[in-house]
Each structure stands twice: as C-alpha cells, then as structure tokens.
C-alpha cells in the first residue's frame, strides 16, 4: 500500500503556509541570530585555545617542579 503524499512529509512540512510564515523569524532577527552565533563560536574557539595553552603551561610547570 502506498503512503499518501502528506504522510511521507514531516509534521513540520505538512502545516499550512500561513502557519509556516508565522513561525519563521523575521529576516532581521534571523540575521542578528546568525551574527550572535558566529560571535559566540569565535569566543568559544578563543576560550578553547586559551585552555589548551593553560594545560600546556601546567604540564611545563609540573616538569620544572620535578627537576
């Protein structure tokens, strides 16, 4: 038995066009979210790099203590 066209689609896709437009953020909000996301990702990369350096320094410190 074949599935109807609507049954194959996800529940999100099967809602009306009007509801889809209401649930979508406005282009300005979407752009702001993208900028914020990129900014947060950059900060996360910086934090990870700093933590890596701290770990390296801690290992060096431990080596010098052992001498």
From Swiss-Prot:
Belongs to the rhabdoviruses C protein family. It comes from the Viruses. This is Protein C'. It comes from Vesicular stomatitis Indiana virus (strain 85CLB South America) (VSIV). Seems to stimulates transcription by the viral polymerase. May play a role in viral pathogenesis or transmission by insects vectors. The P gene has two overlapping open reading frames. One encodes the P protein and the other the C'/C proteins.
